[in-house]
Curated annotation (Swiss-Prot):
GO terms for biological process: translational termination. GO terms for molecular function: ribosomal large subunit binding. One of its GO terms (cellular component) is cytoplasm. Keywords: Cytoplasm, Protein biosynthesis. Belongs to the RRF family. Pfam families: RRF (PF01765). InterPro entries: Ribosome_recyc_fac (IPR002661), Ribosome_recyc_fac_dom (IPR023584), RRF_sf (IPR036191). Responsible for the release of ribosomes from messenger RNA at the termination of protein biosynthesis. May increase the efficiency of translation by recycling ribosomes from one round of translation to another. Its main location: cytoplasm. Signal peptide: none annotated. Gene3D superfamilies: 3.30.1360.40, Ribosome-recycling factor (1.10.132.20). This is Ribosome-recycling factor. It is found in: Cytoplasm.
Length: 185
């Protein structure tokens, strides 16, 4: 039962790290990356559809993204969704593809994005700690109910702490890399 609790906590922590990676990828760094547009929803035939399901992305150079829709009739809808998105894109439509040129980030904007990244990183760490707290409560309950011995409970708690530390360190590593990427001119 202790192993199951630890496995479940590990899976949840892995998901929290994945969410943090996606959050970090959606923050603009002044460099063209398709991950910027992962959260853009296009009104496609009346239903909100993720952009990556409607088009392919290409990055011909560091400041340009080419978006080629699978269905040319969706070109205008995609362009509208990109213009309305919080990414701040200025798409240009040539009838076949949408070209987005990523402008250079100002120093103030970079610092603002670093604050956002730190906040998202802290949110991820808090969610990992909450997962740890719930798993520890489960372990304590198992020991209290006599389903596991105190030694097993203590061992499980040590493993849980190591698991938590590894995941928090992973978030810190992602955070440092994203900060360096943002501050790189």
């Amino acid at each position: 039962m202790i192993e199951e609790t630890l496995l479940e906590a590990g899976d949840k922590m892995d998901k929290a790290v994945e969410v943090a990676k996606e959050d970090f990828a959606s923050i603009r760094t002044g460099r063209a990356t398709p991950g910027l547009y992962n959260r853009v929803l296009v009104d496609y035939y009346g239903s909100p559809t993720p952009l990556q399901q409607l088009a392919s992305f290409a990055v011909p150079d560091a400041r340009t993204i080419l978006i080629t829709p699978f269905d040319k009739t969706a070109l205008r809808d995609i362009e509208r969704a990109l213009s309305d998105s919080e990414v701040g894109a200025n798409p240009s439509n040539d009838g076949n593809v949408i070209r987005i040129t990523i402008p250079e980030l100002t120093k103030e904007r970079r610092k603002e994005y670093v604050k956002i990244v730190k906040a998202k990183g802290e949110d991820a760490k808090v969610s990992i700690r909450n997962i740890r707290r719930k798993a520890k409560e489960t372990l304590d309950k198992l020991v209290k109910d006599g389903e596991a011995g105190e030694d097993e409970g203590a061992r499980g708690e040590k493993e849980l702490d190591a698991l938590t530390k590894a995941h928090v360190d992973g978030i810190d590593d992602l955070l440092k890399r994203k900060e360096a990427e943002l501050l790189e001119v």
